[in-house]
Amino acid sequence: MASRRRKLRNFLNKECIWTVNPMSGDHIKVFNACTSISPVYDPELVTSYALSVPAYNVSVAILLHKVMGPCVAVGINGEMIMYVVSQCVSVRPVPGRDGMALIYFGQFLEEASGLRFPYIAPPPSREHVPDLTRQELVHTSQVVRRGDLTNCTMGLEFRNVNPFVWLGGGSVWLLFLGVDYMAFCPGVDGMPSLARVAALLTRCDHPDCVHCHGLRGHVNVFRGYCSAQSPGLSNICPCIKSCGTGNGVTRVTGNRNFLGLLFDPIVQSRVTALKITSHPTPTHVENVLTGVLDDGTLVPSSKAPWVLLRMSDYFSRLLIYECKKLKALGLRSY
């Protein structure tokens, strides 16, 4: 039982960002979180509905008992998981979005036996709430310039998400379209990251391809809830890469207007494929992407439109929580 309490506490502390439930009041605090499937924690759900949801919808009710102290009720996908006494609970609002919070749960001491919690209503519909925006990402991230790259990455260990994205130092590092070029961006839906642009250029024509479209792997944590019918699509996550992408030459299959962001206008109409090279640590566009012309000639990518960003710790954490693949890479253990 102690092991179950420890694993649940670690999951709540390390994999959840919370939205405030309207049920919250002076005597009981209620929060909801939606997070992608964990590579570490298994809540051992049993009902068909709970198992059908492609993510974890987490609800917590926090009650301050006069004798026992903070008591916490935890539910996941509609199943009650545990009633427990916590050593302490700390709630901290996060800047930017209203109604969002980080919660730290102290050691779970024992079961809160005999304590009655009120019914925890599901969160209200938040389908209108947008995911992470490009403005939020750009204004909170650090631009890593070529001359500063060695110092910024020194002593850090990295994992490749794909050839254009890395995890390291508690942050997501990614190649991203510079602010000065966004006005000329030809309608990239979502985040204009190089990972997304490359995927749009080279993806296959099968809408159910999980490599190209990332089906049932993503959530929007700002909503605090994911329905069982959610397809798990994301137009912001940089994890998605087309099924043909790897070290080597990948054929351009569509969206050729995006080539203007990558190559000199003189040659862009002749680019038929992308030569993609993985790099073990964060680097700039010229080291990972080269164009292949119709006669096999290699042409360099344009440096100016693309910057290397190190995302803030908070938004890196948020992006990892939204994606099953990023979690598997970044949260291998607690």
From Swiss-Prot:
InterPro entries: Herpes_UL16/UL94. Its main location: virion. Keywords: Host cytoplasm, Host nucleus, Late protein, Virion, Virion tegument. Belongs to the herpesviridae cytoplasmic envelopment protein 2 family. It comes from the Viruses. Pfam families: Herpes_UL16. The gene is ORF33. One of its GO terms (cellular component) is host cell cytoplasm. Plays a critical role in cytoplasmic virus egress. Participates in the final step of tegumentation and envelope acquisition within the host cytoplasm by directly interacting with the capsid. Upon virion binding to target cell, a signaling cascade is triggered to disrupt the interaction with the capsid, thereby preparing capsid uncoating. Interacts with cytoplasmic envelopment protein 3 and with the capsid. It is found in: Virion tegument; Host cytoplasm; Host nucleus. Coiled coil: none annotated. This is Cytoplasmic envelopment protein 2. The keyword Signal does not apply. It comes from Human herpesvirus 8 type P (isolate GK18).
